């Protein structure tokens, strides 16, 4: 769930209610190319799918978002085209509960992200809290594969199916591939490089804001764990771009996360907005690490925060302050 709030006398608000993965990266300034995570990591660097776990034991995990099917039932006109049959709507609604899965076998890890709503600011304009703006016309699914080459080196690639609507109740789709590599020179340091491609529209890129990616860009990142439960991360966006035409240029991103007893994770960060030539600041938190508190921290399991909140505090071109709020709900089983 993402909220766009403008600083005018009558604030404009926009909302995403069905995004599952954005809140944690957003709260950390978007510096996520080398941060351990399950599904969200593969959107920034497919070589980091599943994080830095050293176990090669077989595992299978499902990721659920119970909010999504509830909204689909309550707001069918926003989720589905009028031509969609009732049976197709029922099947799709049930499928919206499952937002992703991961499968690990030896040195290989496969991840799938299912029907994740785009965060493009233009595509998600909405006027009330639970408006979803033609969700199925503006969402994407990603299949990612990670292969661990050695103890501290991994390669990854992903193929994304992206839907976008340039007119109401009309959509087109495109396939895009991305690649990445991670290297851990020391046990508490991880380096990552990714090459990301995504659709481009007349109004901008698919993940241009607040995620700050452009099509055909090379991005680099580093994370450092000075103490257990502490992550310090830094990225440079768009270091090299295939299509450097009036798009964003190189931008530094910084983030930090502090885990407090697996009950609360505090996050903060900042990034440089090249088009406005000013900093944007981020903050957020995670509540209840179910992997440790509810499941006893099974071997190789990454934290799974049941509720994540993230916000960007920025100023627009007119100098007005704006908040971008993100709230996500996710259950891993």
Regions inferred by a protein language model and the residue ranges of each:
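Subset of outer-membrane beta-barrel
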Residues: 8-333
């Amino acid at each position: 769930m993402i909220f766009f709030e403008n600083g005018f006398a009558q604030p404009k608000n926009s909302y995403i209610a069905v995004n599952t993965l954005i809140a944690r990266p957003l709260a950390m300034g978007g510096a996520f190319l080398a941060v351990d995570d399950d599904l969200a990591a593969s959107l920034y660097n497919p070589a980091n799918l599943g994080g830095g776990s050293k176990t090669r034991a077989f595992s299978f995990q499902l990721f659920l978002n119970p909010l999504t099917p509830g909204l689909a039932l309550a707001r069918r006109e926003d989720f589905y085209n009028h031509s969609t049959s009732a049976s197709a709507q029922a099947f799709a609604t049930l499928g919206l509960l499952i937002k992703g899965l991961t499968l690990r076998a030896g040195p290989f890890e496969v991840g799938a992200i299912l029907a994740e709503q785009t965060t493009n600011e233009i595509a998600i304009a909405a006027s009330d809290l639970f408006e979803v703006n033609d969700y199925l016309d503006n969402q994407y699914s990603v299949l990612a594969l990670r292969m661990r080459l050695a103890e501290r080196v991994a390669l990854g690639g992903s193929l994304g199916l992206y839907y976008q609507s340039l007119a109401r109740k009309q959509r087109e789709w495109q396939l895009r591939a991305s690649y990445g590599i991670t290297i851990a020179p020391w046990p508490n340091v991880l380096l990552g490089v990714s090459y990301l491609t995504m659709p481009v529209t007349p109004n901008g890129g698919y993940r241009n804001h607040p995620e700050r990616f452009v099509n055909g860009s090379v991005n680099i990142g580093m994370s450092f764990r000075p103490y257990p439960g502490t992550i310090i991360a830094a990225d440079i966006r768009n270091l090299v771009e295939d299509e450097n035409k009036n798009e964003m240029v190189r931008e530094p991103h910084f983030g930090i996360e502090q885990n407090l007893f697996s009950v609360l994770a505090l996050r903060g960060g900042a990034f440089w907005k090249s088009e406005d030539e000013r900093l944007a600041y981020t903050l957020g938190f995670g509540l209840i690490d179910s992997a440790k508190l509810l499941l006893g921290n099974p071997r190789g399991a990454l934290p799974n925060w049941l509720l994540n909140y993230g916000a960007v505090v920025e100023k627009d071109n007119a100098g007005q302050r704006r908040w971008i709020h993100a709230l996500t709900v996710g259950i891993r089983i």
